[in-house]
Amino acid sequence: MAGASSVSVLFSGGLDSALLAHLLRKLPAFEGGRGMELATIGLAGSADLAQAASAAEALGLKFNARTITPEQVRAAARSVEETERSQTAHGQLVPPPPQGMRLEVLTGLRLALEGAPTTRVLCGQGADELFLGYAHFLPLRGERLERRYREDLSQLQGTDWPATQRIAAALAKDLRAPYLDPELVQKLSTFPLESRRRGGVPKGLLREVAASLGLPTELAQRRKKALQYGSGIHSVLSRA
């Protein structure tokens, strides 16, 4: 974020976003949290609001919590669908309209971006794919693991991240995903997949790196639900 005077981090209180916030505050431009905004969304009483509050306290940073309503969730989902339809209308090659889990995730990202008070925004997209954070990776080994990893990364880079960028553009946000930096992705390609889940722990390598960089242990080892579950969005859209 060279040249940025202020930036928001989409902050759920989990490992991925906590590490971004921790590293950002070490940069001279954002020393001690100056110019940083931690943007959190969730329905009233949701796990993400509580976890973000405790993580921000552990980091010594302030955060902005946006308590969303079921009506706002449904409206955001319609906006996501409209953004994708508009691409089709303009002759762009895009996937079918998002449904199910994909719609829930994109809806959560749209709501989080709406709540980010700055134009420049960082998010933790890519960490679960690159560091094997998803539960579906757990039983996989060898070629099956390699195949699923390649499928997930291809889906993210070719479909989900471009869709997220379209949402950000519609909201006039400059959204960056540090975990998807090409140099980092290339560097990680030299690490065997099994080494990324040290001891069989999802994102084990990332947890070790985070701890070595000074992230509080409670955050480096924290497990949390995915955005759509921790925020309560799944419970709303699954009934829609």
Q: What positions do the PLM features span?
A:
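RNA-binding accessory domains that recognize and position tRNA/RNA substrates
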Residues: 1-8, 26-27, 170, 212
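Short glycine-rich phosphate-binding loop at a beta-alpha junction
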Residues: 6-11, 120-124, 210
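ATP-dependent adenylation/pyrophosphate-handling site
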Residues: 6-59
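Short, glycine/charged-enriched secondary-structure capping and boundary segments
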Residues: 24-25, 52-54, 79-81, 135-139
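A conserved beta-strand->alpha-helix junction
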Residues: 37, 46-96, 123-130, 183
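Soluble or luminal CAZymes and related metallo-dependent hydrolases
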Residues: 100-108, 201-202
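Active-site nucleotide-sugar/metal-binding loop of Leloir-type enzymes
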Residues: 112-117
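Mid-to-C-terminal catalytic subdomains of enzymes
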Residues: 121, 128-146, 155-240
